Amino acid sequence: MGVTGGLVRSIFFRNKSFGAHDYNNGRGNLGEKKRWSSVRSYLCGDEFNSVRAVNDSESIKDSEALLTMSQQLSSEFGMPFGSVIAIEDSASVRHLEDEDSGSVKSSEATVTQPLLEEKSKGLDCYLKEEDVEDNQSEATETHIPKKHQTTPISKLFLEEDAAVIIQSAFRSYLAIRRSKEEEETFAKEESFSGEESQDNASMGTSLEAQTGNSVKAPFFRRKRVSANRRTLQKNNTQVLRIKEDWDDSTVSSTISKSRIQSRVEAMTKRERALAYAFSQQLRICSKKKQIDRSSEDDSNIGWSWLERWMATRVPDSIPIEPRTDVATKNQSLIRKNRAFGTAGELESCASNDLPLHFESISETQGDATTVLQTEKSSFKPSISKRKSVPSYKSQRKHHKLQATKSDLQQQTKKAKKAKTTPTSCKTGNECEETSHKLNSST
């Protein structure tokens, strides 16, 4: 009502005070004022009707004050005609005021009735719920004077405000309850998270058993796709770096493009060469490892530590004196064989010592067998059966060892012939002696 009401008043309400020179114009414009009042009530509707009668009364009082002022002026300046005009003007003004008030009341009645009907239909639900409050308010209104009683429009506004307050409170209550329910559900989910994870694992295994495919297959596919994308991005970034390099040369675009392409090709060739060299290094290292393993296996193919100990071990029945003689003979043979294999020691660390050591063992075994035969012939009645059994067993073991030793010696001879040359011998006599010994041992 604020601005629009002021505009309506400024347009439709005219000053009700007329001077002496406007007397005839005032009477001629009565019909126009009536028309304006009807138009005003039709157009302005609620805004005009909402203007209270207080404003009208104030305007009427202003007009009366102006009329009194005009009468005083006419009396002071000695204008009797003006006084008559003023009286007639006051009568006409009062008549117009009565007509305006009647039109305003009729317009208010016509406008407020449909508005009240429409709003009452929309607010039946609120009125039904608050019948008790309305009855109480009506009971109190009987005691309230007419000046303080509220209009039906203000009552509707109060009811709407109360409904808004009630709805806001109810919505806040619903929001609080919803938040509490969400917190409770979240706590329950956290408490049962362990059981759900086990259920998920069992479901995954059951799916694998039913379909025959692993559940992680799409995960690996995604990994492959991501790896391919990364390689493509790396290649693209390298090309972009080459292109982004500042080129100060005054060369055509075709030549610059050919240069960039040549750089890319050179880079790819370099990468291929590095990859090939790395693969060759891996192959060489793997071959070396295989050779080392094979050599270790070949060295382990020979006798075990127990067999070697049994071969070098002398039987318990041999006296002490012949043992010392055997040791001196073995030492002399080993010295001669070492003098023979000085040139071959440069190639291998201990390849020549083992077979020669076996040769010395074979010779000692012959001597040991002769000694045993003499002892048996001389001490037949004195030796018991229990002591004689292990001696025969030891002889059988020695014969078996000799057979295996002979095979190994033949293999070592072949290897020596393939590796060493006849220049390895210092003197012909030593070579003949060693060859004669080898033949005698075989």
Swiss-Prot record:
GO cellular component, as recorded: nucleus
Classification via InterPro entries: IQ_motif_EF-hand-BS
Residue stretches of biased makeup (Basic residues): 383-402
Subcellular location: Nucleus
Statement: the UniProt record of this protein carries the keyword Nucleus: yes
UniProt main location, coarse: nucleus
Polar residues compositional bias, start-end: 199-212
Region called Calmodulin-binding, residue ranges: 270-282
Annotated keywords: Calmodulin-binding, Nucleus
Disulphide bridges, residue numbers: none
Keyword set includes Transmembrane: no
Short sequence motif Nuclear localization signal: positions: 385-392
Region (Disordered): 184-212, 375-442
Domain IQ positions: 159-188
Molecular function GO terms recorded: calmodulin binding
Function: May be involved in cooperative interactions with calmodulins or calmodulin-like proteins. Recruits calmodulin proteins to microtubules, thus being a potential scaffold in cellular signaling and trafficking. May associate with nucleic acids and regulate gene expression at the transcriptional or post-transcriptional level.
Oligomeric and partner information: Binds to multiple calmodulin (CaM) in the presence of Ca(2+) and CaM-like proteins.
Similarity-based family: Belongs to the IQD family.
Stated name of the protein: Protein IQ-DOMAIN 33
UniProt source species: Arabidopsis thaliana (Mouse-ear cress)
